[in-house]
Amino acid sequence: IVNPSSQGAYREAAGKYHDRLTFIEQVQVGAGYGQAILAGRDFAGGEPFLHMVGDHLCFSKTPQRCAMQLCEVASKQECMVSAVQATRESLLPEFGTIGGVRLQDLERVIEVKQVIEKPTPTQAEQELTIAGFRSGTYLCFFGMHVLMPSIFPRLEEVISKSNGPVPLTLGLQAALRRERYLGYEIDGYRYNLGVKYGLLQCQLALGLSGVDRDRILTQLIDLLSIHR
């Protein structure tokens, strides 16, 4: 889902892989994240689908990719599942956040009872605390969701009642009142490109996970010694 008139730039960036991609323009500019998801309704074709945000870089701690971890859980549980990551409260202004209960029979899976877009620390402490996590740590969105076709009428419902941009979390709130909705704590890490120093952090994470790790660490030590 892209902004109008930006399709050409994305095709150019995709290079030889552009013919594998389908671009859908979000005609209602500024209508919000929820409206962008709704624009993909026809493309989803009435099937469950994997949604990934475009400004996150994800690294798996296992040979299994992050998206595959999430899809396996959604396939087995046959319901909506959002990938989440333990996140300190200072970063709450950047992410949607869930609250709920850990499932004893399913490792890393949370039955979602509440979801709030970018909560305040006070709001998170009151409504989103999950047993087993230390104080000041919450489960925030990872940038990946497996959504069911039922998300579309939920989004239509909240958009029709709103006078401004609608985040995906409002659609998820409407959905969890009617159907099962889980969170899955991905065995990996996500980095947000869209925040201050986000690109730098992503580049460092990518470099430190590759063959030049020692070289990069040496350069970082040199920089620290210069800029003490």
Describe the role of every protein-language-model region:
Residues 1-51, 58-62:
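Conserved N-terminal catalytic core of the sugar/cofactor nucleotidyltransferase
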Residues 59-145, 149, 153:
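Conserved core of the sugar-phosphate nucleotidyltransferase
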